[in-house]
UniProtKB/Swiss-Prot annotation:
Region (Interaction with SUMO1): 13-18
Residue(s) at site: Substrate binding: 100-101
Site for Interaction with RANBP2, residues: 4, 25, 57
Lineage: Eukaryota, Metazoa, Chordata, Craniata, Vertebrata
Record-given protein name: SUMO-conjugating enzyme UBC9-B
Length: 157
């Protein structure tokens, strides 16, 4: 494991514990021996107030590679969400999470989670990852929002 990645992730954890957005969760997982695994985080993103996502708490796994922060983490909703920019596997499709697009090593875990929360209510229809959600979002917004509200209710804490 890269010393640079672990050092940066330890800093991220410290910063998060000191100050993070209300309702969000970001915690490194534990290894079988009880030690902390800074390369694998369990996160949760609350649905934004005043949106169909409100009331839901959406669980997300953040996996870091040894070359972090040169490369972005993989962010995956568990279980996968109904959303135009979430692949059927649960992986989030967002430009700041793509090395060849908008990823920069200075981007923090907090910024990633806030960016994903923003994406939930404001899908990028130029970059769809899930055909069904994309089609319903484009063709029947009322039905789309109904499904999102049902999903938020299902994942309420």
């Amino acid at each position: 494991m890269s010393g640079i990645a672990l050092s940066r992730l330890a800093q991220e954890r410290k910063a998060w514990r000191k100050d993070h957005p209300f309702g969000f969760v970001a915690v490194p997982t534990k290894n079988p021996d009880g030690t902390m695994n800074l390369m694998n985080w369990e996160c949760a993103i609350p649905g934004k107030k005043g949106t169909p996502w409100e009331g839901g708490l959406f669980k997300l796994r953040m996996l870091f590679k040894d070359d972090y922060p040169s490369s972005p983490p993989k962010c995956k909703f568990e279980p996968p969400l109904f959303h135009p920019n979430v692949y059927p596997s649960g992986t989030v499709c967002l430009s700041i999470l793509e090395e060849d697009k908008d990823w920069r090593p200075a981007i923090t875990i907090k910024q990633i989670l806030l960016g994903i929360q923003e994406l939930l209510n404001e899908p990028n229809i130029q970059d769809p990852a899930q055909a069904e959600a994309y089609t319903i979002y484009c063709q029947n917004r009322v039905e789309y929002e109904k499904r999102v509200r049902a999903q938020a209710k299902k994942f309420s804490p």
